[in-house]
Amino acid sequence: MAKELPEHFARHGANLILLDISPEIEKLADELCGRGHRCTAVVADVRDPASVAAAIKRAKEKEGRIDILVNNAGVCRLGSFLDMSDEDRDFHIDINIKGVWNVTKAVLPEMIARKDGRIVMMSSVTGDMVADPGETAYALTKAAIVGLTKSLAVEYAQSGIRVNAICPGYVRTPMAESIARQSNPEDPESVLTEMAKAIPMRRLADPLEVGELAAFLASDESSYLTGTQNVIDGGSTLPETVSVGI
């Protein structure tokens, strides 16, 4: 959703700061600017607090301030618990937890000083609500984001900061496609088809649907929401078990 979320916020009139480890993010910024949106790209590694702090400093020098933070960086590598290496475990933790921690810590002080700020965390139904074989490290990190969301919401509510989490099910994104390729390299599309069959709405989410939820949580229309888990999964967490009936 690294492309769709910025596009959605831009359509709502937001001035954008895009932070990514890949210089490719500059192409997306140029594309959005070419459509008349205001957009700044900064290249940084969310695992490195110094890199994040320098990037945020450069962005604020150009844009002035940051009102909304959407923590969307995330990775998922499949592997059974016993087969997963320490490097794979730490890869998830460094990006999915420490990355969120580092960016939030860099942005939050300015929000507190203004007594106004909105933070949207991208978690998942995996981890805190459900689990899939082969996603132990991913589940660990996404459950942690729910805990971080609630803790920050309580700690900084009186400072005018709202913090909410989005918990998607399967979304048709490069990450979902990567999981499908890892699961069945010869026919990844069949994996995505089977994913959809297990969802009551019989389809994966469109990234723009998640973007609409993120925009709502970042807007004044959600002014009394903080510390919430917002599930957007087409009903996939509702069935007690796989249906054997109609």
Per-region residue spans from a language model:
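Substrate-binding pocket helix/loop in short-chain dehydrogenase/reductase
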Residues: S80-F81, D88-I93, M195
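Canonical Rossmann dinucleotide-binding motif of NAD(H)/NADP(H)-dependent dehydrogenases/reductases
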Residues: M1-I17
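Short C-terminal tail/terminal secondary-structure segment
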Residues: T226-I246
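Alpha-helical segment proximal to the catalytic Tyr-Lys
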Residues: P109, V154-Q158, S223
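Residue(s) in the substrate-gating loop at a strand-loop-helix junction
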Residues: S124
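Active-site helix of classical SDR
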Residues: T104, T141, T149
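The beta1-alpha1 cofactor-binding region of Rossmann-like NAD(H)/NADP(H)-dependent oxidoreductases
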Residues: V43-A55, D86, L208-E209
